[in-house]
A protein has these predicted regions:
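Conserved helix-to-beta-strand junction in the class I
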Residues: 105-109
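Short N-terminal helix/helix-N-cap motif within the alpha/beta-hydrolase-1
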Residues: 95-99
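Conserved beta-strand signature within the Rossmann-like core of class I S-adenosyl-L-methionine
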Residues: 110-119
Length: 168
C-alpha cells in the first residue's frame, strides 16, 4: 500500500518537531505522508523522497511534497548523509538480510533514523499492479526489531505497527 498505519503518525510528527532536521530522506515515499509531516512540523528541512514504483511519483504528486524525488530501490541509493532517514514501512518489503545491510549503511552516514514497520504477521502481495508492495518478510516482531537494528533510543508500539527512533 502506498500508505501505512495512521495511528503512528502523531509519534513521528512529535519526533520530527523536536528534532528539526536540516535534511531528511524518506524511503518508500508512497503517497508522501512523511514528507507532508516534515513540511508541517519542520518546514525548513530539505527533503528527498525515494520511491521504487514510478507511477506513485505522478499519482501522489511527490514532486510537490519533496524538494527532490528519486525513483530507485533504497538498497541501491548512493548515500545516506542526512540528519534523518525515514524507513516508512519499507523494510518488510525486503529480506531480513537486505534490511540489515541497508541499516548498516545508514548507520555509518545518517544522524538519526525512523523505522515504521508492522509488528504482527502482515502478509501482503502485489497491490494495484505494484510488485514492490509484496511483504517479503511479513512476520517482524517488536522484539526482533529491537534485537536486529542497532542504535534504537526510543520506540512506541501500536496495534499493528511499531515506530522506532535510532541515533547513530
Amino acid at each position: 500500500m502506498p500508505n501505512s498505519d495512521h495511528a503512528n503518525k502523531p509519534w513521528a510528527a512529535s519526533v520530527i518537531n523536536k528534532m528539526q532536521p536540516v535534511s531528511a530522506i524518506d524511503f518508500g515515499a508512497g503517497e508522501g505522508i512523511y514528507g507532508q509531516i516534515i513540511r508541517k512540523y519542520s518546514p525548513h528541512t530539505y527533503t528527498v523522497g525515494v520511491e521504487v514504483w514510478a507511477p506513485y511519483v505522478t499519482e501522489f504528486k511527490l514532486d510537490k511534497i519533496y524538494n527532490k524525488v528519486w525513483v530507485c530501490d533504497a538498497r541501491i541509493y548512493p548515500h545516506f548523509k542526512y540528519d534523518l532517514v525515514i524507513f516508512g514501512d519499507i523494510l518488510e518489503h525486503m529480506s531480513k538480510e537486505d534490511a540489515v545491510a541497508l541499516w548498516e549503511r545508514v548507520s555509518k552516514e545518517a544522524k538519526y533514523a525512523i523505522i515504521s514497520m508492522p509488528i504482527i504477521p502482515f502478509p501482503q502481495g502485489h497491490i494495484h499492479g505494484n510488485p514492490y508492495e509484496e511483504h517479503v518478510k511479513d512476520d517482524w516482531t517488536h522484539e526482533e526489531i529491537l534485537e536486529t537494528f542497532s542504535g534504537i533510543v526510543a520506540h512506541k508500539t501500536f496495534k499493528v505497527t511499531g515506530m522506532y527512533l535510532a541515533k547513530f
